[in-house]
Amino acid sequence: MTVLIERAGCVGREDELVELTSRLARTPASGSAAVLVLGDPGLGKTALLRGLADRVAPPALTAGAGAWEQDCPGSVLRQLLGEDPPDDPVAAADVLVARAAGEGSADEPRLVLVDDADLADTFSLQAIASALRRHREAPVLVVLAATRSTPFLGEIAADTVRIEGLDVAAVGELAVLRGRVLHPAMAEVLTRHTAGSPRDAVALLDELPPARWARPDTQLPAPAHVRDEVQLALAGCGPEDRALAEALAVLGDHASLGQAAALAGLEDPLSAVDALAAAGLVEITRDHRPRWRTPLVGVAVLATMGARRAADAHQRAAAVVDDEVSRARHLVAATPLPDAELADEVARLAQRRGDEGAWAEAAALYRDSSRLTEDPVRRDDRLIRSVDALVAAGDGMGAAALVPVVESLRETPLRDAVLAYLAILRGRASEAEVRLERAWDIVNADREPETAALIATRHVLHSLALCRGDELVTWADRAISLAGRDSAAGVEAAAIRGLGLAMAGRFEEAHDAYALAARRVGHSAQTQRVTMGRGWLDVLADEPDEARSRLEGVTDPRILGGSTRIAMWALAWLARVQFLTGEGEAALQTVAAGRALATTSGIALVTPLLEWTATETHLLRGSWEEATRTARAAEVGAQGYEIMRVPALLARAHIAEARSDFRAVLRILEPLTQAPAGSALSEPAIWPWAETYAAALVAEGRLEEADEFLRPHETRAREEQHRSAQARLATARGRWHGARGDLDGVRDTFDRALELLDGLPLRYDRARVTFAYGQALRRAGRRRDAEALLSSARDLWDGLGASMYVDAAERELRAGGVRAPRGHRGPVDLTPQEETVAEMVASGLSNREVAAQLFVSPKTVQYHLTRIYAKLGVRSRTELAAMAAEPTEEP
């Protein structure tokens, strides 16, 4: 099979291309302009200019500057014009604009591109500056690409576009263009290794054989061109300078200058730091801490040392560093052959770090220990534990890339538990169920209590995702019994056990359980897990302020070496808090952060929860396309676990509700009514779907079903004394009373709902209850009472930025007629209700949709419509829409 290698092209720069092409398109109106594109060498500035030129017509004028031509006046202009420029820069400017205009239309946008503009000769830059000043009306955009800005470039270009390294998706696309299809985890490794530099990534893709791209734990070298540059730079350095460079390379990014100086044997390293900076190898920070110009420079320096000298340096470095993990990793790097004693020492350290919750460190240490282990059984066990720690750290992509390796090993309870763990994070409930059952069946809890406890903790997470509270508590207690309360498995189980209690409706016990867990865990990476669980509980328990305080502190997985998965849960529930308390913009920003973690980690379990909040936020704003997009994103792969399925269904149901398609609401949410016994889906405090379903039943006139459906949910919420759940259900019950014409029932129920919400910062729930109350009173004919509530609801919606519901409240107010000035309704005397119906029908809504939004029957809408036709002299909805579209004459 022949693989065609394509030129890398302009990959991953769509945003920059859109920005530049839009600026070019504005030049006929705004006049000439210049933009400076800045980026480090190798980031693709040239490719960006080439991609921009490919998108425009007529052809752009292009030039590239060179350092050797800086002293040659007009060298860049000569390329742009295709001939020698005039000797005067002002005259040259006029020629440049005329050449750019060509023979086309005078107002057609023209493009001038100069690459490496920081190396351009002064004469050419003067001519470009004069062209922009003297021909301000010309539709010309000059794009100057440079590695660094200069005063003159800054004077020419008012705006700057900075380009950074490519993201993982773009690097993966680059790989495909070079004939390589990388696993997402390997693309992540390559992106991190090269800092997203297209030049360096392409070089490695071309230089390394296919086998090197098979596993994400492979050690990638520096590209040949970087090694050559570094070797040349080191050749010009003195012995002490080189010694410091090698020490920095051996010790890694987190070493202090003092440690590097000690390893290099230097008493005063600052002269060496200056020399390395002058050679272009390092940059100096304010605290005199040298930092490699790019990460690949350090890799290249290490390669110049050779295996023997590098191993000796690592051996010495083990005595210089001051933490046990760094010491162990240096000893491993100094040991090329199996070493049972060192392997055991590293494995014990890995277990300790895992027990403390530092899973990423534990994963690396277990992998090192496996390499040093000669016994195949123990070697495989340590490799499996490395993958388990990767999953615990939230590195789903890295773990997934190693699945073929793990599956090739002999079956053990640990192996099956690890594969189940990864399946849970990927949202594969059936696979996880099968693997967990198999692991539990073959483990001997008497001989391997620690392994049995680990399997039990995976059952805990599985039960959490299935929303089975009692089952979760049972498995958590089993894990604690097997391994002990203070063991890693015990702490992990305790960190989730409180959520199981909450899902079973035992909120007081849940709070007590978390208070105890927080006291036991102290200050370690495990704190992240307990704090997140406690914040999650606070969200469910109507304590949003407490939830925000806790969740905001655990959204960064780098703190204390915590887990990406835990950070994603924290972000998802923090976004929920922000939405409920009226911070829509903050909620969308938090969702975006969660999406980014989901992309890099490969964890699918939390995505629907994030997208549910995004969907509701977009709906409030009337952003239908965005709401539909995020609802679809929530649905992707959300069929396995309830914790994925319920948010996806709620997102779709709320879109249908906003469209007044209550039949669709019932169809979407109907599967949730079939929840088995023991499921948290029957807990109104956990998932707010019951009130939406009941309200849809009422809207469809199925009052007896609505009553029967609401009763057990109301009883449950009342028994648990859960305020917001009772208020939400009371909203549906109030609508039910309204549909039956029971005005006293409407008032009593809605007043009780507002009383329950009093003192809670749940602005979204208060707005919904107030709006529904006003609708019910307006339908009951209590227009003046309804006006006060609807006005309040409108203001509440406005404070939430909910433009769609502000409009709905305004329609309700107009339909009520209280605010309509009598005797000033225009030449045709439509009632306020008729005006509202006419407006909505003219906008394209069906009778059923109008009825749902105005809380009347479709027959009532048709009655109003018949009177409207007669008064306006039209015969159809089409004629009514055409009349509405006619311009209104000013008096």
Regions found by a protein language model. Name each.
Residues M1-S22, A169, P221-D228, A820-G826:
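Conserved adenine-nucleotide phosphate-binding loops and their immediately adjacent elements
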Residues A34, G51-L52, S271, A279, ...:
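Extended alpha-helical scaffolding segments used for macromolecular assembly and cargo binding
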Residues L38-L43, G51, L119, A170-L372, ...:
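Short secondary-structure boundary elements
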Residues G42, A300, L349-Q351, L383-A393, ...:
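Tandem amphipathic alpha-helical repeat scaffolds
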Residues L43, A47-R110, L119:
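Conserved phosphate-binding/catalytic loops and adjacent sensor/switch elements of nucleotide-binding enzymes
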Residues A47, S75, F123-V189, H193, ...:
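Alpha-helical sensor/transducer elements of the RecA-like P-loop NTPase core
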Residues A278, R367-R371, V403-S408, E437-N444, ...:
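Amphipathic alpha-helical segments of tetratricopeptide repeats
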Residues D748, A772, R814, R819-P891:
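Helix-turn-helix DNA-binding segment
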